[in-house]
């Protein structure tokens, strides 16, 4: 049987909030089987809790942000979500003492090591997957994203398009099958990126106050401003794929399907996920009593993550 997973113990880290520029304390706690992924604002009294839910995503400007009916927000959840999804965690309490998850270095890598350091353990309940049964496609001008049936895991294919000398055709496309090993080695270190002109505008509006060359790739009109350069030659498209993994995990379950996207972002990813979940004929819950029948990325061998 493919079993649910949680952490062995709680773990805490402090980082900077991308938007506020203030310190944020993040605590990740184990949770009982069938709890799901729960987010908590512990700076509020009483604490405010959110369950992973595509319909709670209320703002996708610069990041994925959940907003409840009272207007309480938790922003920048996507990089942590991607790490949680890649490691196949099902039950987790995510606590922050601010309106946002810390940006760390702009990638998922710090969250991966935080989770692995806490340890991952299986629980005595079957893991539920969402299996895609029908193709669903969302378009916005020339941008599009779709999910279609694929039973052996989550296959991802992403293409970006930017008119910039550092973003040539050979680094605009990437595809991968999601597994812990593939995620850690191929895309977990891919950082968020932005353009200098956008940074200046956002900070003049009181946004992205925590953004810096320490947690983002910044490009001017001609070059990359980070002295150390890129971590992968195709780091930009890999980060967009990382974002998509996090955005698709807003349903709280690992998806079995094939995701293909062209110039997609947080907003379009969320619209796609909502459209899939709203169509009861397009998906179903599945479990695997026979481990050998499960997607390879979730079989026992994948316990060796690094």
From Swiss-Prot:
It comes from the Bacteria. Pathway: Glycolipid biosynthesis; lipid IV(A) biosynthesis; lipid IV(A) from (3R)-3-hydroxytetradecanoyl-[acyl-carrier-protein] and UDP-N-acetyl-alpha-D-glucosamine: step 2/6. Its EC number is 3.5.1.108. Keywords: Hydrolase, Lipid A biosynthesis, Lipid biosynthesis, Lipid metabolism, Metal-binding, Zinc. It catalyses: a UDP-3-O-[(3R)-3-hydroxyacyl]-N-acetyl-alpha-D-glucosamine + H2O = a UDP-3-O-[(3R)-3-hydroxyacyl]-alpha-D-glucosamine + acetate. GO terms for cellular component: membrane. SUPFAM superfamilies: Ribosomal protein S5 domain 2-like. It is an enzyme of class 3 (hydrolase). Its cofactor is Zn(2+). GO terms for biological process: lipid A biosynthetic process. The active site is at 266 (proton donor). Zn(2+) binds at residues 79, 239, 243. Catalyzes the hydrolysis of UDP-3-O-myristoyl-N-acetylglucosamine to form UDP-3-O-myristoylglucosamine and acetate, the committed step in lipid A biosynthesis. This is UDP-3-O-acyl-N-acetylglucosamine deacetylase.
